[in-house]
């Protein structure tokens, strides 16, 4: 058949598809990427967009590995660490579903739980630290020190290992994940913004003027991930809402995106409202309320006595089905500081841990915060997640797509 234009063949790239916490994403070793995608830039972004199947005007990511939600449109690049006393560098890319954008501005706390396991399985952690006990089956905990390259922070993952191999199966249950697995403890060290104040405005609570919405009380914090917290009742909600109530309401989504954009300007993350469209990953916007009974998305009944506070958070323009791991760090940190909206909704006072209700159930997370010379700081935040490999092999994409 003469006259046909020859098309570039597909290329094969080694990759691993992993769940971490309530998210899942495609993991790459930096050295396995095509050479032109081993450095930041358009080639890398275009490769990851094609892998995930974005931008997709249908919003389904049918022609890629993405799952058409913010929790499943994620990519991770791991490499031997460039930092002293760290095992790996971890770079996270949040891929937009309907726009040609990979957002590198923040971390994914859920996938962090999978980074430690991936680092061990990929040979980035010395074998001496993952001993094989031979015929004796012994599960040990291996500490993996991770440099989070997006936000320049240290994260410690404590990964269970049995006879030299990552232990993925177990009985740890995590609301938002159907099946139990092995527990991975994750510690976020000094999770507040290292380049500025934890509270960028200098206040625990601000008046945030949002055109078309009004003036809202807001706690704007940069810990784990920049987050704008507002009171649920200020925008007509009670904090027990599930996804359909928010995600099925275009007006509500537009309102929350407007709040997020004006919060981003107030926090100094962007200079103009227009920039928010290409910075979808950060900041997050969340609304809080005192505890109340509700039915989680699984049908499980959550009772007031089981939780300290209700939190609902939006990610990439949609209400999250559970809670982003980094937002959980922000929640724990804000809850530990008397006077923030999160702390007040949880009953006020000093606390080192908080159990919050989210659409899929509950989560407990701890934080150690203290005030030094009038500035609040947090030394670490701790949570438990789980992770496992879903698939490993090769990703195939057209060779001319990047």
Residue ranges and their predicted role:
Residues 2-402:
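A glycine-rich beta-to-alpha transition motif near the start of alpha/beta enzyme domains, typified by
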